[in-house]
Amino acid sequence: NQKNHAADVSPTASQMPKLVGLAQASRIYRNLSTKNSSKFSNNGNEIAWGTIGNASTSEGVFFEAINAAGVLQIPMVISVWDDDYGISVHNKDQTTKESISKSLKGFQKTDNQPGLEIIEVKGWDYTALIDAYSYASKLARNDHIPVMVHVTELTQPLGHSSSGSHERYKTTERLEWEKKHDCNLKMKEWILSNGIANHDDLELIEKNAKILVKNERMSAWNEYQKPILKQREIFYNFYNDFIDKTNNDINLQLIKKELVSNTEPCYNDIISSARKSQYILSKFPNINSKKFKKWLNNLKSEIEEKVSSNLYSYNLDFYNKIEITPLEYDENPKIVDGRIIIRDNFEALLSKHDNLLIFGEDVGKIGDVNQGLEGLQEKFGKIRITDTGIREATIVGQGIGLALRGFRPIAEIQYLDYILYCIQILSDDLASLNYRTNAQQIAPLIIRTRGHRLEGIWHSGSPMAGMIHLLRGIHIIVPRNMTQAAGFYNFLMTIQQPAIVIEPLNGYRLKEKLPNNLGDYTIKPGEIEILKKGEDITIISYGSTLRLVQEASKKLLNNGISVEVIDIQTLIPFDTNKNIFKSINKTNNLLIVDEDVPGGASAYILQQLLEKQNIFKHLDSKPVLLSAKSHRPAYGSDGDYFSKPSFDDIYDAVYNIMHDQNPNKFPRV
C-alpha cells in the first residue's frame, strides 16, 4: 500500500513517457520474479497514476504514450483535467471534436479487442467521480487495463497564470457559468444537501483553513530566512570594521544601504554585496581582509554546492576508487565479427543480472538490425528481450520508469539520428532527474544506439555537440569498436548512472579478437586510451574515425612524423585524470579529429583541454580542429570523402602543422 511519487516535469505532456514505464514495471513484476522484486512491487498490483491538462493532450508524446499503453496493456490511469481551454485557446482550436475522449474512441477496448478504457465524468460531480475512479482503479489494478479518465466541466478561477486574467478571453456567459460550477462551491452544495454539515460549520472550516495556511506559510518563510539573515549580520560586522578604516568610503556605504533596504534578502544579495566590497577594499592596503575573503569564499562555495551538486550520480573521487576488471584473451583468441562480441557480452550480462531488460525497435525477434542480440529473445524470453513500436520518446520513457522501479533497462534507439525524436525527454527528464531531486531519485537507464560515419545522408551523422550540451547529467560514451562498447556496458551495470552508448555503425562486421571474460571485464568512463605512442604531435579522436587516424599515423611515420594517437572513449565524463595534458606536454602539438560539424564536439574537447587541463602554454603551435562539413553527409563514397574527415585530410593537417614548425624538413606541398 506504499504510495510513491516520481519527480514531475514541467514541459507539457513530458510526464507521459515515464508514466508508461512506471506502469509497465507492474506488469513485468506480475510475470517475472527477480531477486529484489519484493522491494519494488507486490505482485504487480501497483497503478501508475498520472494527470495532464486537456490542451497538453495535443502534444505528440501524449498520443505516443496512449498508444504504447494500449499495446502493452499496463496499469496506468491518466486523468485529463478539461476546463475547455489551453491558456486562452478554446478546445475547438485544440482538439478534434472538441473532446479528447471522443477523439480517442478508436483506442477504446471492446469485447473482442484490448485497448484503453475511456471514462468521461464531470469535475464538479463528487459521487460520479468516486464511481469513475473506483471503476478505473479496479480495472487497472486487477486486470492491467489502462484507463483514461476525462474530467470535464472544470473551472479556472484565476486564469492560467498570474500574468493575466482569464477575463481577457472568456465570454461573460462563460465566466458566470464558472462561478456557479466552481468545484469548491459544488462540493459545499453537496455536503449541505446531504446533511453532512451545516453552513456555519463549513464557513468555520474555510476560515480556519485560510488562517492555518497563512500562518504555516509565514513560519516556513521565517525558517528559510534565518540562516540568510545570520550571514547578513556577519557581513555587517565586517562592514563596521572596514568603514572606519576606509574613511567612511561612500561606495562602501552605498553597498550597505542597498542591502539594508532589502527586507527579504537572498544569499546572492549578500554575496554580491561582499564581492563588490572586495574591489573597494583592494584600494586600502592597510586593511587586512583575509578573514573576510575566507568567509566569502566559504559561503559562496557552500551555496554553489547546494545549487550545483548531484548533476551526476557519482563524483570523480568515487570513480577513482573503483577497480576495473581488465580484458583477458586466450593464447590464440578467435577472430570474430564485432557483433558476436556485443551479442555474447549481452548474453553474459542477462545471465548475470536477472533485472536486466533490453527493448527497442527490432531487438527481439530478429535480434536487432545488426544482429547484436541474435537469439537472445529465444533464450531469455519476450519479457526481457522485447520488440517495441517506432516511438522513441516512449521507449526512453519506458526506460526511465522501469529504472525508477528497480529494473536495469537497456533501451535501444535504433540509430543515432532517431535520438532527435526523444531528445526532449532525455534532456528535461532523464538528464536532470538526479539533479532536480537532489539525488533522491535516479534512473540508471542505459541508452544503446549506433551511429557515426556511413555513406549517405541518413544514419551517418554525428550530432555529438547537441547531445553534449543538451544532456549534461548523462554519460556520453563513444567506443571505437564492439570490444570497448561491451566493456562500458559491463561497467555501467555496476553503477547507478544513466548513460548513452553510441556503437560505431560501420563496425559490426569488422573483425576483433574475442575476449574470454565477456560480461566481466570493465572499462571506466572518463579514461582515455593511448593507441599509439608518439613524440611530435598528439591526435585525439573517438569512434569510427579513429581507424583513419591510426592508418594516417602509420603513413606519417614513414615521413618522419611520430604521432601519438589517443582515443577519448567518453565525451562525458572527459579525461578525468587529465592524461591528454601529459601527452601534449610531451609533443607540444595538437590535432583534434571529429566528424561532428565545425564548432561541434571538437570545440567542446578544446574547451575542456584549455580550461580544465591548461594546455595552452604547452603548445608550440595553435591547436587544429579537423571536423566534418556543416551539412549532412552527401550520398556515396564521394559524399563521405568530401563531407567527413578523410585519411588524406588527417595526413595533410598533421603535415601542415609540422611544416609550420620546420619548413626545411617538411617543405610545403
Tell me the role of every PLM-derived stretch.
Residues 67, 397-400, 490, 554, ...:
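Alpha-helical segments flanking ligand/cofactor-binding loops in enzyme cores
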Residues 11-13, 17-19, 24-135, 440, ...:
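Phosphate/pyrophosphate-binding betaalpha-module
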